[in-house]
């Protein structure tokens, strides 16, 4: 599968970027929904997401990820298995993601799931 820089479309010499930092949401470290590929310029330069001027790009990616989660989690409550399958994560990662969330009839509320995936906060008006 050929990968391209999310920003400029260049291929080759790409770096994986976690939209929500691994330190914020360790459970999503291997979740492909939380990863985009960036060229070194858009990843590490001053204009890159980790650079001095990267805040807007970072916010844009977070909003897009949040919107994607809102589309995927399209009902009010989900089981742990449904969450795991939707995110494509392991049992252990799912338990880690959900351990602080309240259960209702052994199910988790949509807004709590999305907030947890986003590192504990929601961004903008989605």
Protein language model regions, located:
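Short cysteine-rich loop/turn motifs with clustered Cys
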Residues: 1-15, 39-41
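Cys/His-rich zinc-coordinating "finger/knuckle" motifs
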Residues: 12-16, 46-49
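Short recognition patches in nucleic-acid-associated and regulatory proteins
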Residues: 13-27
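Polybasic, low-complexity binding patches
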Residues: 23-34, 44-87
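Helix N-cap / beta->alpha transition motif
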Residues: 39, 79, 109-110
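Helix-turn-helix DNA-binding helix
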Residues: 94-95
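Short Lys/Arg-enriched helix C-cap and helix-to-coil transition segments
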Residues: 99, 103-126
């Amino acid at each position: 599968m050929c990968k391209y820089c999310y920003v400029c479309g260049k291929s080759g010499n790409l770096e994986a970027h976690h939209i929500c930092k691994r330190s914020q949401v360790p459970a999503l470290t291997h979740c492909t929904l939380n990863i985009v590929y960036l060229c070194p310029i858009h990843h590490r330069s001053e204009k890159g997401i980790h650079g001095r001027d990267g805040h807007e790009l970072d916010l844009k990616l977070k909003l897009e990820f949040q919107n994607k989660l809102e589309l995927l989690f399209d009902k009010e409550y989900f089981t742990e298995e449904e969450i795991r399958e939707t995110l494509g994560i392991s049992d252990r990662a799912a338990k880690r993601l959900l351990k602080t969330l309240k259960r209702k009839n052994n199910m988790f509320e949509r807004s709590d799931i999305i907030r947890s995936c986003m590192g504990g906060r929601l961004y903008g008006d989605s």
